[in-house]
């Protein structure tokens, strides 16, 4: 027994000495740093954000050029048809069948001159919508207004003042909770009486990210709720079917715009605090509004000409009134630019009076002055008597306005279905379609042609769009190992840190592309790196755009996501609910080249450099640690002459599994629209 203890002690001592020797052998941290240390944590316009913004403006330039071909009204109507076709494709189409609404009124509230009906209807079987219908007391047919809820924890109750003002002006008004808000939480924690996330944007992030993978968008079902709300209004004897209108603010402004774009039964459209120019939104969202809201970022939206001018063009020749806020996080300059552009089209064909705008000097809200301007516009085009002031409102508490006994439709109705189930079913219905591969997607029309880019030494000038300029940033020798540091300048704005780690021997060795979940090799990875070096590999390792040394030195902050503020910098940066990396990803979706494809581009750029500068034209291998195993597998499936060297504990994201298992949280950098269909 004594001998056994001695043997164990000796082994432990040897292991300890081995670990200490490896730690002592590790180069200093500066050996792995290519660029100067980042400035103190602060909002920063990074090269990658600049790159994304310029891409968005370039694509919008192409859209504006296409509008120059609108010479006749027939040209305009042809473009409308094409844009609508693209929009429907982006959201994955609409449900084919209008199933029974099964509408029921669960209660009534008497008010001065009107009453409020508490309504439940099913937009799809088992998808329950909680709505309030504000009805004037006077008999006869009335114009109607849809008021989709913006982002608020209490949903429709938050917008009751607008609804009361409209009903007192003579409109029948229907306002409903969006998915993930008010009485329609999809992730309700019954024990703690709250959402597992939050009822402002977080549930939208969970739903919307999964919908992307299934080749659709959360907007599909938000639009469908609105279409079915119109269907409901048309069942009422007190509604004039020729005078259906819509207005809403923030997320309700988004729904207002998209519902009206798709449903021509809506005659007058008045979005608030939504319309801008998306390239400006790309530029400021991280700093002003970092919460994830995927329904507003349709796949290829800017690329396909459906920036906000394109959406408004779908309204023509219907009257449109845009309410805006000068201090909004939807940039007012973009609002003015978009409205003026669409205004010129309306003027060109004799409808200048059908488009208007009002901006209040305040933050993100449907202020009283904006409401008054919008309601006056609605009155004019609905033949309502002109009034000069807003009527008073009586604020009711949330519980009074609840349509359900329990406060949540998912608790109230045993057959209620979660939208996560519906998204999974959508995928199951569509997965038998034509197969596609990641390689086909990567080399699609948006591929920048890296395989033909020129590689040369950096001389101080910005790189062109089709060249890789390498800059030597230093070298560190540690025993028999050298770490050469490079900065690869490319794509006009971007600079990618790269490490070439190799033994001093001049022998030709295999090249391993080493990918870490946070970027390139770090000091803490040295023991693993040493094993690969001893096994006959040279290592090339990079920081993909937006990661590692190219991270933005900023921790996004949002009053709508208090959990974000409680996270440390590293966790907050990659949060899929709200954060810098998530916004980078959504920006890439808008411009039609998802972030995952851009990370593969970075690996291809590194490979081109290694082949040309280091004269390594043989087959490469690639490996990834942690979540980067997904990227390494994607690289091996996509780029020629790169073989996967799997890690034994690798965790590879499989998009179809995420959808089928209704996974709520997963690494946001691997968001790939339609990824679940890749074979």
Task: Label each PLM-derived region with a short phrase.
Residues 152, 178-183, 206, 276, ...:
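Alpha/beta-hydrolase active-site loop signature
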Residues 24-128, 308-310, 316-512, 517-538, ...:
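Alpha/beta-hydrolase-fold serine-hydrolase catalytic core, especially in secreted/extracellular enzymes
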Residues 7-18:
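Bacterial N-terminal signal peptides
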Residues 228-303, 606-673:
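Primarily recognizes the serine-hydrolase "nucleophile elbow" in alpha/beta-hydrolase
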Residues 138, 192-249, 559-626:
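Gly/Ser-rich "nucleophile elbow"/oxyanion-hole loop immediately N-terminal to the catalytic nucleophile
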Residues 152-162, 178, 189-190, 517-530, ...:
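The serine-hydrolase catalytic nucleophile loop
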Residues 133-135, 141-150, 508-517:
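Short beta-strand element of the alpha/beta-hydrolase
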Residues 158-174, 183, 524-541:
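Short amphipathic alpha-helix adjacent to the substrate-entry channel of hydrolases
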């Amino acid at each position: 027994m004594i001998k056994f203890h001695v043997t164990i002690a000796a082994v432990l001592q040897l292991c300890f000495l081995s670990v200490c020797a490896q730690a002592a052998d590790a180069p200093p941290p500066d050996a792995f740093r290519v660029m100067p240390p980042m400035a103190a944590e602060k909002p920063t316009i990074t090269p990658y954000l600049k790159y994304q913004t310029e891409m968005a403006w370039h694509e919008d330039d192409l859209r504006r050029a296409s509008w120059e071909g609108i010479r006749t009204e027939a040209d305009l109507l042809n473009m409308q048809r094409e844009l609508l076709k693209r929009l429907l494709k982006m959201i994955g189409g609409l449900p084919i069948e209008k199933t029974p609404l099964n509408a029921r009124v669960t209660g009534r509230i008497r008010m001065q001159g009107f009453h409020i009906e508490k309504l439940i209807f099913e937009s799809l079987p088992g998808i329950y919508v909680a709505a309030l219908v504000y009805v004037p007391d006077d008999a006869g047919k009335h114009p109607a207004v849809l008021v989709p809820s913006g982002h608020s924890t209490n949903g429709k109750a938050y917008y009751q003042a607008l609804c009361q003002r409209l009903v007192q002006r003579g409109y029948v008004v229907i306002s409903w909770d969006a998915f993930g808000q008010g009485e329609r939480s999809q992730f309700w924690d019954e024990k703690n009486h709250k959402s597992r996330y939050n009822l402002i944007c977080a549930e939208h992030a969970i739903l919307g990210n999964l919908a992307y993978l299934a080749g659709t968008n959360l907007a599909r079902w938000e639009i469908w709720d609105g279409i079915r709300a119109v269907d409901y209004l048309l069942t009422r004897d007190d509604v004039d079917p020729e005078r259906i209108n819509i207005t809403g603010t923030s997320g309700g402004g988004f729904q207002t715009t998209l519902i009206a774009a798709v449903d021509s039964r809506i005659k007058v459209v008045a979005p608030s605090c939504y319309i801008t120019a998306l390239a400006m939104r790309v530029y400021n969202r991280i700093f002003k509004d970092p919460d994830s809201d995927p329904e507003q970022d349709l796949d290829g939206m800017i690329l396909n000409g459906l920036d906000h001018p394109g959406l408004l063009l779908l309204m023509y020749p219907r009257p449109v009134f845009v309410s805006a806020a000068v201090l909004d996080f939807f940039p007012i300059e973009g609002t003015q630019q978009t409205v003026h552009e669409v205004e010129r089209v309306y003027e060109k064909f004799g409808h200048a009076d059908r488009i208007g705008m009002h901006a209040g000097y305040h933050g993100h809200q449907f202020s009283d002055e904006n409401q008054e301007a919008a309601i006056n516009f609605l009155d004019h085009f609905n033949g309502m008597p002109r009034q000069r002031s807003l009527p008073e409102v009586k604020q009711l508490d949330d519980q009074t306005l609840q349509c359900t006994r329990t406060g949540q439709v998912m608790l109230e109705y045993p057959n209620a279905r979660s939208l996560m189930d519906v998204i999974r079913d959508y995928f199951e219905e569509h997965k038998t379609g034509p197969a596609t591969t990641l390689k086909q997607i990567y080399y699609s029309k948006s591929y920048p042609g890296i395989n033909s880019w020129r590689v040369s030494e950096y001389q101080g000038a910005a790189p062109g769009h089709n060249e890789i300029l390498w800059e030597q940033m230093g070298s560190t020798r540690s025993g028999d190992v050298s770490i050469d540091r490079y900065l690869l300048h490319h794509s006009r704005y971007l600079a990618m840190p790269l490490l070439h780690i190799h033994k001093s021997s001049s022998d030709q060795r295999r090249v391993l592309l080493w990918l870490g979940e946070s970027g390139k090799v770090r000091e803490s990875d040295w023991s693993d790196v040493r094993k690969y070096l001893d096994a006959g590999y040279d290592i090339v390792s990079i920081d993909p755009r937006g990661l590692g040394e190219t991270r933005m030195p900023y921790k996004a902050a949002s009053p709508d996501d208090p959990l974000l503020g409680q996270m440390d910098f590293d966790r907050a940066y990659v949060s899929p609910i709200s954060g810098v990396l998530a916004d980078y990803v959504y920006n890439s979706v808008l411009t039609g080249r998802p972030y995952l494809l851009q990370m593969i581009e970075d690996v291809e750029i590194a490979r081109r450099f290694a082949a040309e500068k280091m004269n390594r034209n043989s087959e490469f291998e690639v490996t990834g640690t942690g979540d980067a195993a997904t990227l390494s597998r994607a690289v091996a499936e996509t780029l020629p002459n790169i073989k996967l060297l799997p890690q034994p504990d690798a965790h590879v994201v499989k998009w179809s599994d995420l959808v089928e298992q209704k996974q709520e949280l997963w690494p946001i950098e691997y968001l790939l629209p339609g990824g679940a269909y890749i074979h």
